[in-house]
C-alpha cells in the first residue's frame, strides 16, 4: 500500500476566529523536501498514494480548515467519486443525516436529533460542501451505547444483540489489534481511570473498526 503522510507546520500571525480568515495564518511544510507546499500539491501527490494520513485534533480549527480545502480539491479532481466519512455522526443517525442532505429537515433538527458536537462549526463547511454537490456523507461511528456495553461487559454481549442492532456495527467479531497498537494504548492510558482494563481497550477497537 502506498502511503502519503502530511506534516503541517502551522504559523499563526494572530488570533483566528473564522474559517474565512484562516488562510493567511498557516503554512504547509514538506519535511522531506524541506519546502513549503500547497493544498493542490498534496492532492497531486495523492496520485502516487492509496492513503493520505492527516493528523488532527478535534478542537483544532486550522486543521479542519485544511481538511476542508483538501476535500474541495479532491472533488475538483475526482468529482462524485469521493465521499465524506465523519466520526461525529453515529451509524444510527445515518437516516437523519441523509434527510438533512436531501433537504427534508433543517439544520436545527439535525443538530438536535444527531447530537452534534459543540464544535460542529469547524466541520460544517465540509458537510455543506457535500450537501451542495450531492456527495455521500457517512455516519461512521458505532453508537456510543454499544461502545459502553463493551467497556463494561466486553465483546461477548455484542453477539447477543438483535440483527437490526448488529447492522449498526462493524462485522463481528472485530479485530482487537494485538501488538504495538495495544501496547501504545495502555502506555497512553496508564494512570487514567480504567486505563488498565482490557474492556476499555476493546471498546476503543470497536470505534476503530467502525470507522475504518
PLM region spans:
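N- or domain-start disorder-to-order transition segments that initiate the globular core
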Residues: 8, 17-49
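Sec-dependent N-terminal signal peptides
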Residues: 3-13
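A substrate-binding/cap region within the structured catalytic cores of diverse enzymes
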Residues: 95-212
